[in-house]
Amino acid sequence: MSVVPVVDVLQGRVAVDSEVTVRGWVRTRRDSKAGISFIAVYDGSCFNPLQAVVNNNLSNYQDDVLRLTTGCSVEITGNVVASPGEGQSFELQATNVNVVGWVDDPDTYPMAAKRHSIEYLREVAHLRPRTNLIGAVARVRHTLAQAIHRFFHENGYFWVSTPLITASDTEGAGEMFRVSTLDMENLPRTEQGKVDFSKDFFGKEAFLTVSGQLNGETYACALSNVYTFGPTFRAENSNTARHLAEFWMIEPEVAFASLDDVAALAENLLKYVFQAVLNERADDMAFFAERVDKEAVTRLEKFVSSDFAQVDYTDAVEILLNCGQQFENPVYWGVDLSSEHERYLAEQHFKAPVVVKNYPKDIKAFYMRMNDDGKTVAAMDVLAPGIGEIIGGSQREERLAALDSRLEEMGLNKEDYWWYRDLRRYGTIPHSGFGLGFERLIAYVTGVQNVRDVIPFPRTPRNASF
């Protein structure tokens, strides 16, 4: 007996007339008047289920087969045969059906065979991967993650595991989750009445990381080309379709690289991973195009074949001011472009992905390299048609005096960044990098509108279930 995944049978990788066993869950069961049952079995290896044809001459047909309902787990042995019906090329002529697990009460089973609202599925996040939608999202998420690692490996990058607990605020925004073992009901105090964090586990204030970038830079200054890929955390009280409190980030850091170098890297990365999804997840993408977003496949195909446009922030503002379109958010030099501005540039003006460069220093982080004009920094955003910003990056400030000036300007204590400043004291180099939010990437690929539905267990304000 050979146990095989459903995908191998459906894709013809198992010889016709072979006896195999598949293990999975019942999606549907229908019975014919001729005493034959058709069981759709899925195991998550691909989008489509495998049809098992079960005759009533099986010894447990009456007691087990006719009691099967959506969600029951089964182990079915049979012969692979060409399917005479539409919808699949192969099916399984069952010779044995073993019920591994029953659904206690089919009438109250939360994942009964019907369409559920996306809001309802969030309430049963432990069961929602059994649905077509979330199962497809999970496979695409996996394929994207594998493609990202593959891209960087093939291009000579080293993956660096950066810490989740940190004492540094990379973005300087202060929206961080505190990590503490202090007794909240009996906090130690200093003579000034403040919380005495010297008594805490780490002997100082500690937080969940908002970015692996600063730590990644230390390894780029030794290994040249590195990237991080891991969870990050923002205590931002935002209840929007684009925000999560816990999400994953991809952050390459490249030694001796300019802003233009990492803009090219961003373009190559996105095109590589999008092509991987088109090649490897055709069945799931066909589902997204049919049920979620009819442009899901064509959007990726067009993206892969498009040349990225490039524009300076100052010129982008001029384009927006002179386009004749009314925006909800005002446009002026110095404003942080909103999603509607970004989408106009990518969808209406350039009609292609676009890299906006050289932003005003006042709306960007302390570590971004100051340009010669003293007003802008070497920062970039990659804007994609259909979503807006998908990547944010910059050339990092490698000059110690300029970095110290920015820290002071932004009210940050340079002593807190002593180790980061050391990189500028000992063999400093120009270097650049960017951040790519993984969940926003998945949402863009699948057409799923809310990032809460592209991560297994979303963490949002007032929600940390499961």
Swiss-Prot record:
Molecular function GO terms recorded: asparagine-tRNA ligase activity; ATP binding; nucleic acid binding
Entry EC no(s): 6.1.1.22
GO cellular component: cytoplasm
Biological processes annotated in GO: asparaginyl-tRNA aminoacylation
UniProt-annotated location(s): Cytoplasm
InterPro entries reported in the protein's UniProt record: Aa-tRNA-synt_II (IPR004364), aa-tRNA-synth_II (IPR006195), aa-tRNA-synth_II/BPL/LPL (IPR045864), Asn-tRNA-ligase (IPR004522), Asp/Asn-tRNA-synth_IIb (IPR002312), NA-bd_OB-fold (IPR012340), NA-bd_OB_tRNA (IPR004365)
CDD domains associated with the record: AsxRS_core (cd00776), EcAsnRS_like_N (cd04318)
Predominant location category: cytoplasm
Keyword Membrane: no
Entry-linked Pfam families: tRNA-synt_2, tRNA_anti-codon
UniProt-listed SUPFAM superfamilies: Class II aaRS and biotin synthetases (SSF55681), Nucleic acid-binding proteins (SSF50249)
Record PROSITE patterns: AA_TRNA_LIGASE_II
Keywords: Aminoacyl-tRNA synthetase, ATP-binding, Cytoplasm, Ligase, Nucleotide-binding, Protein biosynthesis
Catalytic activity from the UniProt record: tRNA(Asn) + L-asparagine + ATP = L-asparaginyl-tRNA(Asn) + AMP + diphosphate + H(+)
Nucleotide-binding is among the record's keywords: yes
Family: Belongs to the class-II aminoacyl-tRNA synthetase family.
PANTHER family, A to Z: ASPARAGINE--TRNA LIGASE, MITOCHONDRIAL-RELATED (PTHR22594:SF34), ASPARTYL/LYSYL-TRNA SYNTHETASE (PTHR22594)
Assembly with partners or alone: Homodimer.
Protein name listed in UniProt: Asparagine--tRNA ligase
